[in-house]
Amino acid sequence: MRQITIRLADPSDAAALCDMHQDFMSYANTLQMPYTSRKFWEHRMSQGDQSATRLVAVIDAVVVGLLGINQNSNPRRRHVVNFGITVNKSYRGQGVGSALMQAMIDYCDNWLGIRRIELEVFANNPDGLALYEKFGFQREGIARDYAFRDGRYVDAILMSRINDQPK
């Protein structure tokens, strides 16, 4: 198995992220719109959003995955983050998602003092559900008609992981 390096994303990753999001499953299982341009990703990666942290997975100098962590700005919910993840189609099933998840959990638990990590996953994404459950996320409910995708409304499953031992 090749070594997976996790690091903070930077503006030079825009082209790789644009390419990764051209695959149907990369935008079908996220809230990204299809056909995003390189300019869109350059803008997104260069803006200094203080509430977002983006981690990338790299194999052999190629960006193969992205995980975005979004901290809640409401003072009463600063203990909460939400995240989204995408893995390049050529690298799925090779531990990239797990490496990104482990890095995110370590970052949230040991550096940010986050108590609750939450996410929404489309109900018809069994690979995503399995990955999140592998890392201790529990199902909390269903958001009916959560998003419009490929001509129809789809449900999402709400999940979270509670850190009972914040530092």
Where are these regions (language model features)?
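Terminal substrate-recognition subdomain of acyl/acetyltransferases
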Residues: 152-167
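Conserved active-site alpha-helix within GNAT-family acetyltransferase domains
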Residues: 94, 98, 110, 123-141
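Acetyl-CoA-dependent GNAT
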Residues: 8-11, 24-90, 101-102, 107, ...
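Conserved GNAT acetyl-CoA-binding A-motif
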Residues: 109-120
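A short beta-loop-alpha structural element at the N-terminal edge
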Residues: 4-19
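Conserved beta-strand-loop-alpha-helix junction that forms the acyl-donor binding cleft
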Residues: 92, 119-129, 146-150
